[in-house]
From Swiss-Prot:
Catalytic activity: GTP + H2O = GDP + phosphate + H(+)
GO biological process, one term: mitochondrial translational elongation
GO cellular component, one term: mitochondrion
Subcellular locations according to the entry: Plastid, Chloroplast
Similarity comment: family membership: Belongs to the TRAFAC class translation factor GTPase superfamily. Classic translation factor GTPase family. EF-Tu/EF-1A subfamily.
UniProt keyword list: Chloroplast, Elongation factor, GTP-binding, Hydrolase, Nucleotide-binding, Plastid, Protein biosynthesis
Positions of the tr-type G domain: 1-189
Function: GTP hydrolase that promotes the GTP-dependent binding of aminoacyl-tRNA to the A-site of ribosomes during protein biosynthesis.
Keyword Hydrolase: yes
S-S bridge residues: none
Name this protein carries in UniProt: Elongation factor Tu, chloroplastic
Organism: Gymnochlora stellata
Binding-site list for GTP: 55-59, 110-113
Length: 363
């Protein structure tokens, strides 16, 4: 709802087409439960910036999909109900945002229209600030904007006239939210100088043209005609980029931070899948084993309730894929002594054997 309100509010100012709520929750399973399952991408512009906006799920059973969306963010808008206060998944979202490196957050307290008591809204705000502090975000400095996405959206859909600043209080609150996002979330430093890399999010075929892989360019840049390697899960393959497309526009080149579709020469749909990476030749290699320094989250932090031993086989999330791995050895982070068992809260160095090769590099 907020995503739709933002795109429509900004479109009335810029004169561009906004996205209606029904257009954002587009997959059939999303409609069935009235919730956002897969991350949906929209774009919009403020006076100073162009945004690619990922609408992340707010439901605990879709955390896996949120990971694939959150791993791409330069900043986030955390939506909390002003009427109900933070939910259990609010903590999950903050923990996840911290873990995947979302640098800055702006908070939107939604459903302000359902709160009669001003003090109640202030209490919710205090609770949110405390929660931000608990997850190492600056609670005191984080902008918190109140409003009602639904009432703003109704105001925007009920009229055919352009709604400018000052003509509707609920729409103004959405514009104030985006002013704060513009000011508070720093412009990211793009990794354009590094070797090109894009994690594959999705793959589809275009009849008569070939296979297209989509994803966000993590670093470097790519031009039509460049040679790239497809790395991970299967044998590494070399191919040539024959087309680039972003938000329905054909491009000659693309750089870090862009969400693009990439047409690849001589590649079948079966040759490439989500979880692989497309990279500058020789810049990254596939691995089936690695060593990692790990902090095992406690139950209170949203982690495990029980200890685990060597031989434990968890899922490892890397970029856009999850792959099973076997924990081969465990050593104490302090004195490097061999550990038989790891308890939530421990810091350990673990050696892991993966069931499939994936493109990883030293962190």
């Amino acid at each position: 709802t907020l995503t739709a309100a933002i795109t429509m509010a900004l479109s009335t100012i810029s004169g561009k087409q906004g996205k209606k709520y029904d257009d954002i929750d587009s997959a059939p399973e999303e409609k069935a439960r009235g919730i956002t399952i897969n991350t949906a991408h929209v774009e919009y512009e403020t006076e100073t910036r162009h945004y690619a906006h990922v609408d992340c799920p707010g439901h605990a059973d879709y955390v896996k999909n949120m990971i694939t969306g959150a791993a791409q963010m330069d900043g986030a808008i955390l939506v909390v109900s002003g009427a109900d206060g933070p939910m259990p998944q609010t903590k999950e979202h903050l923990l996840l945002a911290k873990q995947v490196g979302v640098p800055s957050i702006v908070v939107f307290l939604n459903k302000e229209d359902q709160v009669d008591d001003e003090e109640l809204l202030e209490l919710v705000e205090l609770e949110v600030r405390e929660m931000l502090d608990n997850y190492d975000f600056p609670g005191d400095d984080t902008p918190i904007i109140t409003g009602s996405a639904l009432l703003a959206l109704q105001a925007l859909t009920d009229t055919t006239d352009a709604i400018g600043r000052g003509s509707n209080p609920w729409v103004d609150k959405i514009l104030t939210l985006m002013d704060n996002v513009d000011e508070y979330i720093p412009t990211p430093e793009r990794e354009t100088e590094k070797p090109f890399l894009m994690a594959v999010e999705d793959v589809f075929s275009i009849t008569g043209r070939g296979t297209v892989a989509t994803g966000r360019v993590e670093r470097g840049g790519i031009k039509i005609g460049d040679t790239v390697e497809i790395v991970g899960l299967k044998e590494t393959r070399s191919t040539t980029v024959t087309g680039l497309k972003m938000f329905q526009k054909m491009l000659q080149e693309s750089i870090a931070g862009d969400n693009v579709g990439m047409l690849l020469r001589g590649i079948q749909k079966t040759d490439i899948q989500r979880g692989m990476v497309i990279a500058q030749p020789g810049s990254i290699t596939p691995h089936v084993s690695f060593e990692a320094q790990v902090y095992v989250l406690t139950k209170e932090e949203g982690g495990r309730h029980t200890p685990f031993l060597s031989g434990y086989r968890p899922q490892f999330y890397v970029r856009t894929t999850d792959v099973t791995g076997k924990v081969e050895s465990l050593k104490s982070d302090e004195d490097k002594s061999e550990m038989k068992m790891v308890v939530p809260g421990d810091r350990v160095t673990m050696s892991v054997e993966l069931v499939q090769p994936i493109a990883i590099e030293k962190g």
